Swiss-Prot record:
Protein name: Ferrochelatase
Keyword check for Lyase: yes
Catalysed reaction equations from the record: heme b + 2 H(+) = protoporphyrin IX + Fe(2+)
Keywords from the named record: Cytoplasm, Heme biosynthesis, Iron, Lyase, Metal-binding, Porphyrin biosynthesis
InterPro entries: Ferrochelatase, Ferrochelatase_AS, Ferrochelatase_C, Ferrochelatase_N
Alphabetized GO MF terms: ferrochelatase activity; metal ion binding
GO biological process: heme biosynthetic process
Annotated organism of origin: Escherichia coli O139:H28 (strain E24377A / ETEC)
Role, per record: Catalyzes the ferrous insertion into protoporphyrin IX.
Family from the record: Belongs to the ferrochelatase family.
Length: 320
């Protein structure tokens, strides 16, 4: 019997190719055109997106990207490539490809790369620890569209999420411990997750429950009292209500109440990006300190640390 050859597809959101208004506009157009991200009626959404949002937001967002851009590209791309390369070294007999839902490299190019290696089974690992229809669901949809155009398709194992995975929780806990050792234990550990519209959760997206699961498991692993750990949601967009409490409003409130020392971690981000390095590490730091807080540290994402790569290797091993 012929032995199955397995490949691994690491999937993430994506990033502009450059910190310029033109590149950001291309990226945002693709991202905000996905019904999984914005499900507003197209008759209403297209004119708003093309006539207002893209022209106004692209130059401003490009400046934010420029503030965190690295020598080799955007942080998300740099760290994602490092993850791909490190996992390939950890699993030398298994092809590992990287694909993004939006921008380059695309999910289609990643699938084609693996098929060119003659794999007949692909393990898809969306690097979103907590499932949401707007992230993991978007990967699923695009993968289905890609394979629908193939005459022959490989076997697919799709990892829905890993919110309570033991190795993932331990890696997060060790990052927190390292930060406490360096900066001292903070008055409060704030866990900031990317938000989604509240309506999505009301309609069945179990993302908030998966975030609560990670928060509970991490607090338990650290042996921290519940009142010392807080969960919030960031990066809201548009006018409708999103999951609460909001990170920026919470940090302002905590500073005003006299909480002196905060450390913030973003467990839902597998790699540092604009939302962590600029929004959390810079913007929200200013919010907290401006409201009266004294000390604020951002705990980096797991990125391509050895623990994170080992977690990925162990996670996909069950499906190989």
């Amino acid at each position: 019997m012929r032995q199955t050859k397995t490949g691994i597809l690491l999937a993430n959101l994506g990033t502009p190719d450059a910190p310029t208004p033109e590149a950001v506009k291309r990226y945002l157009k693709q991202f905000l055109s996905d019904r999984r991200v914005v499900d507003t009626s197209r008759l209403l959404w297209w004119p708003l997106l093309r006539g207002v949002i893209l022209p106004l937001r692209s130059p401003r967002v490009a400046k934010l990207y420029a503030s965190v851009w690295m020598e080799d590209g955007s942080p998300l791309m740099v760290y994602s490539r490092q993850q791909q390369q490190a996992l390939a070294q950890r699993l030398p007999d298994t092809p590992v490809a990287l694909g993004m839902s939006y921008g380059s490299p695309s999910l289609e190019s990643a699938v084609d790369e693996l098929l060119a290696e003659h794999v007949d089974h692909i393990v898809v690992l969306p690097l979103y620890p907590q499932f949401s229809c707007s992230t993991v669901g978007a990967v699923w949809d695009e993968l289905a569209r890609i394979l629908a155009r193939k005459r022959s398709i490989p076997g697919i194992s799709f990892i829905r999420d890993y919110a309570d995975n033991h190795d993932y929780i331990n890696a997060l806990a060790n990052s927190v411990r390292a930060s406490f050792a360096k900066h001292g234990e903070s008055d409060l550990l704030l866990l900031s997750y990317h938000g989604i519209p509240q309506r999505y959760a009301d309609e069945g997206d179990d993302y908030p429950q998966r975030c609560r699961t990670t928060t509970r498991e991490l607090a338990s692993a650290l042996g921290m009292a519940p009142e010392k750990v807080m969960m919030t949601f960031q990066s809201r967009f548009g006018r409708e209500p999103w999951l609460m409490p909001y990170t920026d409003e919470t940090l302002k409130m905590l500073g005003e109440k006299g909480v002196g020392h905060i450390q913030v971690m973003c467990p839902g981000f597998a790699a540092d990006c604009l939302e962590t390095l600029e929004e959390i590490a810079e913007q929200n730091r200013e919010v907290f300190l401006g409201a009266g807080g004294k000390k604020y540290e951002y705990i980096p994402a797991l990125n391509a640390t050895p623990e994170h790569i080992e977690m990925m290797a162990n996670l996909v091993a069950a499906y190989r």
